[in-house]
Amino acid sequence: MTIPYPLGPPPAPRILVLGIGNILWADEGFGVRAVEAFHKAYELSDNVTILDGGTQGLYLVQFVNEHDRLIVFDAIDYGLEPGTMKVVEDDEVPKFTGAKKMSLHQTGFQEVLSAADFMGHYPERLTLIGCQPLDLEDWGGPLTAPVRGVIPAAIETAVRVLRSWGVAVTARPEGAAVPPLLEHDIDFERYERRAEPAALNC
């Protein structure tokens, strides 16, 4: 019996680049701000989805289930110096995702991964790009300087991982129009600058 050879190359893996966190709690917004900056800087092939996951918790399971590989930006309490970036991959990820300090109403991303695993859709490849936060208690506050300074390195790490997975990553032309990730995005630079007048009036 002859087994027919599949026509054409295998389909490209479906990849999700995800930022999670709460921009209203200072450094907990790192993941969201990092994925926003990544989206503004690069264009990707059609098999890659970029998502601002915010604080959706278990609702993110549906997105994880629909993809084969996953890159996550997040603020993680590694117990390191604030502003330290740490990259954890594949089987090492679950032990770290539960360490993040989160608001009481939020579900940790570890539970999202556990739910995806239970449903038989755990990512075949997984990279967590985490940053040690300095401040998670400043309601309405911007990212602190050490955490904000990590964003360029976090973005370049995601680019390196994607290219190692065979993804074409292209820098957007300067001044190119970039569609928002969310319909009602809160602009990062405008949000961060709004704290400056208050500081000057102190």
From Swiss-Prot:
This is Hydrogenase expression/formation protein HupD. One of its GO terms (molecular function) is aspartic-type endopeptidase activity. It comes from the Bacteria. The gene is hupD. Ni(2+) binds at residues 28, 74, 105. Pfam families: HycI (PF01750). InterPro entries: Pept_A31_hyd_express, Pept_HybD-like_dom_sf, Peptidase_A31. PANTHER family: HYDROGENASE 1 MATURATION PROTEASE, HYDROGENASE 2 MATURATION PROTEASE.
